[in-house]
Curated annotation (Swiss-Prot):
Transmembrane segments: none annotated. Pathway: Carbohydrate degradation; glycolysis; pyruvate from D-glyceraldehyde 3-phosphate: step 3/5. The gene is gpmA. Homodimer. CDD domains: HP_PGM_like (cd07067). It comes from the Bacteria. The active site is at H9 (tele-phosphohistidine intermediate), E87 (proton donor/acceptor). It catalyses: (2R)-2-phosphoglycerate = (2R)-3-phosphoglycerate. Belongs to the phosphoglycerate mutase family. BPG-dependent PGAM subfamily. This is 2,3-bisphosphoglycerate-dependent phosphoglycerate mutase. One of its GO terms (molecular function) is phosphoglycerate mutase activity.
């Protein structure tokens, strides 16, 4: 069976501050770095031969991958970085404290923005402090100004099908270091999770989700490598 390891980046500075991060390039905290290294130590003990890796173009995911690979003694592994694996864009919520936003707009409204499948937050204003239109990593890209989980899946899925799935079908054990929502989108696709329940699936930081896939990329087993920090798992399809 081919193995796929999904790693949500370690704790970021804005995770710690309870802020909506999205596409903003918040870096890892010291705890996040430790989580990334711990992920690598856990993956080093897995009976797998990881030969390919993918990340977003966001620093917290890239550094999580590199710190994990360092512990695995696999820094030579070819890694492809692509914006299609970026976190969901939180639009006008970017940079806001989640608790303060709930106090201002009401918990019910913020819950809709955060947890509905197809309702995005208000768009980010052009020229905002968090406008990334001049960031060189996004040159030539039509950057979204907000996203729902559905539109996040709409950009993640073609990349999965074109770039990641072919290697897995060929039997290449693969690692992906990305973000809560881009990984949630992949889990939805792989496990056929319904729209109404996928938003409730929590993926912890720095705890690899190891999935074994058959030749048709159907999951046959799934587990978190750190059982003490594990969250609920999707049902096998």
């Amino acid at each position: 069976m081919t193995k796929l390891a999904l790693i949500r980046h370690g704790q970021s500075a804005w995770n710690l501050e309870n802020r909506f991060t999205g596409w903003w390039d918040a870096d890892l905290t010291a705890q996040g770095e430790a989580e990334a290294r711990h992920s690598g130590k856990l993956l080093a003990e897995v009976d797998a031969d990881f030969r390919a890796g993918f990340t977003s173009v966001q620093t917290r995911a890239i550094r999580t991958m590199w710190l994990a690979l360092t512990e695995m003694k696999r820094v030579w592994l070819p890694i492809e970085k692509d914006w299609h694996l970026n976190e969901r864009h939180y639009g006008g919520l970017t940079g806001l404290n989640k608790a303060e936003t709930a106090a201002k707009h009401g918990e019910d409204q913020v819950h809709v923005w955060r947890r509905s499948y197809d309702i995005p937050p208000p768009p980010l204003e052009v020229g905002s402090t968090f406008d990334l239109s001049t960031d060189p990593r996004y040159r030539g890209i039509d950057i979204p100004n907000t996203e729902s989980l559905k539109t996040t899946l709409d950009r993640v899925l073609p990349y999965w099908q074109q770039k990641i799935a072919p290697g897995l079908i060929a039997g290449t054990d693969t690692m992906i270091a990305a973000h809560g929502n881009s990984l949630r989108a992949l889990v939805k696709h792989l496990f056929n999770v319904p729209d109404e329940t996928i938003t409730g699936l929590e993926i912890p930081t720095g705890n690899p989700l190891l999935i074994e896939l058959d030749p048709n990329l159907k999951p046959v087993s799934v587990r978190y490598l750190d059982a003490e920090r594990a969250h609920s798992l999707p049902d096998l399809p």
